[in-house]
Amino acid sequence: MRSTRNSFACLCIMLFGMLFVPFTLRAEEVGEYIAIRKEGASRIAVVLDKTSADGGKQREWARSLDVTINKGLDFTGLFNLLPAPLNIRNGQNGGLNFASIASVGGDIYAGGSVTKRSGRPVLEMHVYDSSGKSLLARTYTGEESQLRAIGLRFCADLVELLTGKRSVFGTRIVFVANRTGNKEIYMCDFDGENVVQLTNSRSISLTPAVSPDGTYIAWTDYTSGKPNLYIKNIATGAKVSVNKHGVCISPAWRPGTNTLVTTLSYEGDQDLYLIRADGTVERRLTKGGGIDVSPTFSPDGSKMAFVSTRQGGPQIFIQDMNSGQVRRLTYSGIYNTQPSWSPNGDKILYSSMQKSGEINIFSINVDGSGLLQLTSGSGNNEHPSWSPDGSMIVFSSTRDGRRRLYVMNADGSNQRPLLNMQGEQQQPSWSVSK
């Protein structure tokens, strides 16, 4: 058992540290070009040149980097990627022909080269606008095994340059899958790559939640025959159990703290309780009657949305964490569950069953206005979770016959599968990497 715990700890340390690649600035960014794209604007047309390289190993690195950068930028939904025209370079001096960038409809140009220094890949990238003004020039380096992370580091820098946000690069998604025959917890990169199994309970593991700082992971486990909540320190592997009599389900971490909220029933009703990371109960939060589950927090941790049956069928309510005052948020739909509070703090996602029996994902402003249906006519769509930057949503859907994970933009556009994996996947939770 000790060997298993140690292996899990080492694996998690490796996973959460993988994307932190050292890089050096080659030149400063041009400040006035930060956040040139506003939300809701059309895609930015990027002429993306192939990475140049000399030597067999460097050309191999260049091909790998090109794939990573193309896929990474395309995944965001922010860009219209254009191949570099044949006349991109001036014949005499080999410089860039900026007129050709505009001629193919490009807004900006991105390209660079990879060299080898002390056996390590060194990627030098440049970004220009169509007039030839330099927007970014940076050098990235790391081990050969970190080529994917090197390419994604550039993608993150480009997105931040143009939008002011870091986007989803470097984030991870935890979820439940049954490809082994049992429901276990898995983790993958933001784009579905590098899937790793985190639990091996050979039973049922559900509702994974990673703490806001990436230190802990909590989940519900049925190995003992009843639902127990486990909290694990990812770095050390230390694990504690919240082993209370009765129900112990649906954990959610409170931002800015090492505490989480979960549903317990050891005092009678199924209510929400504040739990410390060591597994001890700090206090009871809800006493409204009925069943209270599925908590989610505002970014500052001052308010909590949750599902309650206190007024009949399950609906979304919001509670002030200081005063304890509770108000109902949702009134449309006969069965509203699985809320997820946006990182911007202004919206809440949730799953809603309509009278037709179909389950779809909706977005609503925290004041109850602005109800927007994001999915329709494509099976049951559930378990929405915001990306840490608020630009995307991961969810589960049966549109292809079995439960699989999908992603979409925050406005519901560009819905597509996240990963190709045997069995079914559900209950995704998008998280940061420590």
Swiss-Prot record:
Localization, per the record, is: Periplasm
**Domain of life of the source:** Bacteria
Single GO cellular component term: periplasmic space
Region Disordered, annotated ranges:
413-434
One GO biological process this protein is involved in is: protein import
- The answer, when asked if Signal is one of the entry's keywords, is yes
This protein's major location comes to periplasm
Q: Which Gene3D superfamilies match?
A: Dipeptidylpeptidase IV, N-terminal domain, TolB, C-terminal domain, TolB, N-terminal domain
Q: What keywords appear on the UniProt entry?
A: Periplasm, Signal
Quick one: signal sequence residues?
1-27
PANTHER family found in the cross-reference section: PROTEIN TOLB (PTHR36842:SF1), PROTEIN TOLB HOMOLOG (PTHR36842)
Q: Which family does it belong to?
A: Belongs to the TolB family.
Q: What is this protein called?
A: Protein TolB homolog
Q: Which organism is it from?
A: Chlorobaculum tepidum (strain ATCC 49652 / DSM 12025 / NBRC 103806 / TLS)
